[in-house]
């Protein structure tokens, strides 16, 4: 029920075709299936008429929206939603970094309603670990994306997900992640410990990390993020911003 709410969640797709080595979703939910663009826009219009002023586009793999349809894309959907009367804010749920390339950013930066908040999944700040995870980017590519967003959207909040204790993660690899998290200076992050998902390649690896090591690493990253979050929020002390009440 959305009674007395100002924010609504719009599911725009289901499924995933990424096959990260730790994730069961592609096996459980199947390949990418995008909703018809006109259907999504019509739902947003109806919600706007009911008084909702903020929408969040969600899905299993939001970045892949439209790729199976061939006649639209995530950026096109965003810009069409931007034109709907009554909608004041548009957000996206977690998104893959390589979607937010220069072409995407150049198209959507004209939006008057897209919030200055991008939750860009990192998982690890170590290239060797990312490769074992079957993530399709490097830390250098990720940082380039983040810097591009911060240039196009001043004072944007970049948040992320960080997994510690992935199978085979050495002390050296973890330190690379810790240093990268400091460098990226995230506004916030969801830090979590790797857990096995039966049926995934990562779960079959023999080099699982002991629970006590994962817990120690998690606490270290959480502490780093705590400082970067405080630093980000301190920028806005003394400034005035528009808010939505519900």
Features from the language model and the residues they span:
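Proteins enriched for Cys/Gly/acidic motifs involved in redox and nucleic-acid/cofactor modification
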Residues: 1-65, 103, 108, 118, ...
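Conserved SAM/AdoMet-binding glycine-rich loop
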Residues: 49-171
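Short, hinge-like loop/turn segments at secondary-structure boundaries
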Residues: 73-74, 108-109, 177, 206-209
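Conserved N-terminal phosphate-binding loop of PLP-dependent enzymes in the Aspartate aminotransferase
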Residues: 86, 186, 201-205, 209, ...
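Hydrophobic, well-ordered secondary-structure elements that form the walls
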Residues: 120, 161, 181, 189, ...
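Contiguous mid-protein beta-loop-alpha structural module that forms a pocket-lining wall or clamp
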Residues: 169, 183-186
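Structural detector for short beta-strands of small beta-barrel domains
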Residues: 237-246
